[in-house]
């Protein structure tokens, strides 16, 4: 018997059960927004991509040393489909898992997870504190300064671009567009 695809409400409840950090919740919402945008752009299942984006860091706050492994256990216990579990685990490829992203969904999650952090940090240093007026060239300018958002592993983003066969500028633009759709929820609407 195949597990039923989880509804967004189920993912949201699970996320909030394991996370109290406002910044982690906002990160999950940002990744969900970008995943939904990318699914629409590529004619994929927006609900599935969004739910996977929302739940991808489920275990990070409580179990940072077991990131992805603990999420696998939790999702299995909750009867999530294997496809969803594999996608979530694959975003930690080369960091905390050896599950390589294979599908477009998995490659996208892998590529944009770190990138959302760079976009947020870039937006927050701008006068508007918003993604609504943010352009890819501003993010690329900050990209070059390795001290800026030093916690963002740019090599993961570059590997993700290679996996997807897209240029960095295109991925940045798509990430910004997806984040604009959830700008209110992630606190980056600003005054723009």
Explain the meaning of each model-derived region.
Residues 42-149, 158:
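Divalent metal-dependent catalytic cores for phosphoryl transfer on phosphate-bearing substrates
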């Amino acid at each position: 018997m195949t597990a039923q695809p989880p509804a967004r409400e189920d993912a949201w409840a699970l996320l909030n059960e394991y996370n109290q950090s406002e910044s982690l919740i906002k990160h999950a919402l940002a990744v969900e927004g970008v995943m939904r945008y990318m699914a629409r752009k590529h004619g994929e299942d927006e609900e599935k991509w969004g739910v996977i984006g929302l739940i991808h860091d489920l275990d990070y706050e409580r179990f940072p040393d077991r990131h992805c492994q603990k999420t696998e256990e939790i999702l299995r216990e909750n009867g999530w489909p294997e496809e969803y579990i594999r996608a979530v685990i694959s975003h930690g490829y080369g960091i905390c898992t050896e599950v390589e992203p294979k599908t477009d969904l998995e490659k996208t999650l892998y590529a944009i997870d770190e990138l959302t952090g760079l976009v947020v940090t870039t937006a927050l240093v701008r006068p508007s504190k918003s993604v609504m007026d943010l352009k890819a060239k501003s993010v690329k300018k900050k990209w070059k300064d390795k001290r800026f958002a030093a916690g963002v592993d740019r090599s993961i983003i570059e590997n993700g671009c290679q996996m997807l066969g897209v240029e960095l500028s295109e991925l940045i633009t798509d990430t910004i567009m997806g984040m604009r759709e959830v700008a209110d929820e992630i606190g980056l609407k600003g005054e723009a």
